[in-house]
Amino acid sequence: MYLHYTLLHQTNLKHILIKLLKSYMLALSVIVIVKDAEIDIQRCLESVKWADEIIILDSGSQDNTLEICRQYTQNIFSTDWPGFGVQKNRALDKAQGKWVLSIDADEYLSDRLIEEIQWIISKSENRYDAYAIKRISFFCGKKIRYGDWYNDKVVRLFRRLPYISFTPAIIHENLNGYLHLGELKQAIFHNTMKTISQVLLKLEQYSS
């Protein structure tokens, strides 16, 4: 009985140490929430495939989204849809990296932004615990040059700390809790609605 307890204790301790070591070694976790995103998700994941960990949280995709995601990660989880803020926090809870990058399925990183993020997370000393990123949006294939989406900035890169999380908003969630905010020079691309039919579908989803 004592031997069995000792072996069980050693096994549990080993698993804990492995998990801690893995967490220590991971520099960056990427979190993505998805649903029926087969049109955009491959370009998104292709731009972050260099990350140490990719976490996918799906809320009931009926298209080929999950098949595409499996080409990039096995960390795929299915859940209900409580809204953007809660869903992103669920994905954040599963991340193990020192840094976290939250990216939407219809976004992707520029090559220069990839280099800048890699430089940021490799620094041994850094006073910032979160970074705002310029976002360049496209509507029906055209770059948006006016309105709220022009000169848009989103806080998406941040340290994985217990006091940093997303607001529990259904839409238009924000990151909260960071103390020192930096700003990256390079941009993330946002390929928003590509056709008028997508615009009408989005309006219907938000009004229902």
Model-based region annotation:
Residues 3-5, 10-13, 17:
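Short hydrophobic targeting helices and cationic amphipathic motifs
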Residues 16-46:
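N-proximal low-complexity "stem/linker" segments adjacent to membrane-targeting elements
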Residues 38-39, 47, 58-67, 104:
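A conserved acidic beta->alpha catalytic loop
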Residues 40-42, 63-72, 112-113:
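Acidic helix N-cap motif at the loop->helix transition within catalytic regions
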Residues 44, 51-60, 77, 105:
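Short beta-strand/loop segment that forms part of the nucleotide-sugar
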Residues 66-96:
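Conserved donor nucleotide-binding strand/loop of the catalytic core
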Residues 86-92, 99, 103, 110-208:
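Catalytic-site signature of metal-activated, phosphate-bearing donor transferases
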